[in-house]
Amino acid sequence: MRCTILTLFPEFFDSPLDAGLMGKARESGLIDVALVNPRAYTTDRHSTVDDRPYGGGPGMVMRVEPWEKALQGIEEPGRILMMAPKGRPFTQAMARELAQEESLTILCGRYEGFDARLEEIYPIEAVSMGDFVLNGGETAALAVLEAVSRLVPGFMGKEESGTEESFSAGLLEYPHYTRPEDYAGHVVPEVLRSGDHGRIAAWRKECSLRLTLSQRPDILPEAQLDEADMDFLRGLSRNRPGRNLYCALVHYPVVLKEKNSGATSLTNLDIHDIGRSSCTYGLGGFYVTTPLEDQRRLLDTLLRHWTLGPGSRSNPDRAEALGRIKGVDDVRAAIEDIARRTGQVPYVVGTSAKGAGNATPASVRAMLEERPVLLVFGTGHGLAPEVLEGCDAILRPLRWMDGYNHLSVRAAAAIIMDRLLGDCY
């Protein structure tokens, strides 16, 4: 594979390209790396490669001319990557994809980045190493080059080395041990000394699963899992922020069809479905709020039937879900009940299909790490203004990019729970 790196600081790569396996791969001709400095393609005596941005603002911007001329000088550029924070996240899957290419070209940005016209002239793919900022693209380019090169056949020597490491199957790698067998009382696990390859493979897989759940649960949804893996993961203890999440279905005050505030009647489907969703996602509780006595009696009758009466015997799963439901007069009563149960006053997060909101699923997950969160859902045409005004935050609406986002409250509740907690939290 041939890789051409365009950089203002070619000396940055001197040591890394000569060290270890990369140095051996270059010596053998397996990997060919060319360093091109765009300053060589400037025409002024100062070798200027940047200039002030149009429209004002801080910093300098890379000029088009020297970079375009440098690209023109590459006989076979192959895919052209630009290391930039705005780019597509670099992953192991992308590394495998790029390892199939015969040629790659990597542009290392500096300052405020490139004149955008360079991307109009060439089919450049912006690639990011993560949500952080570096002084330039050289460090990122080196990471890409190494990740891709080690997947080229022959680079690693033993091919399994590249396929058994972290992320190869969407999981973190298992721990490694070497001699001595006992170091200051820290002993190598017996299974690794047993010589039983089947037990060793099973132990390593379980370690990978355990580490991934503990350290990177966010990558589990895309991991390669079989049914045995899923059974093993279910049996592990884990952080359960969902237990810190509560929801309330508000029937007063809500917006009515006439746009005034008032009360709505309880709906059997809403209670059942949100109750089942709350149980599925492991919420701490589900409150149904209504100050109307006849509606409270109706709720009590329904809950008794499913949790204590004939319904509990015919459908134990439904009994478990509806057993988490509690009727209260209003949102304030739900807040007070959560405070009594947990010793902490919850954050109150409202929901609405209108407006921009000021909270996202990620920010609500962060709240869950601090103290309980009460999600508030409105019936009718949504929560009344006075309820929303009393919330600590309001979630951004679902499907806000499209013109139609008229979901039933039970559908919205299920979607929001899934976005907050997914399969692993």
From Swiss-Prot:
It is an enzyme of class 2 (transferase). It is found in: Cytoplasm. One of its GO terms (cellular component) is cytosol. Keywords: Cytoplasm, Methyltransferase, S-adenosyl-L-methionine, Transferase, tRNA processing. Its main location: cytoplasm. Homodimer. Specifically methylates guanosine-37 in various tRNAs. Belongs to the RNA methyltransferase TrmD family. This is tRNA (guanine-N(1)-)-methyltransferase. It comes from Nitratidesulfovibrio vulgaris (strain ATCC 29579 / DSM 644 / CCUG 34227 / NCIMB 8303 / VKM B-1760 / Hildenborough) (Desulfovibrio vulgaris).
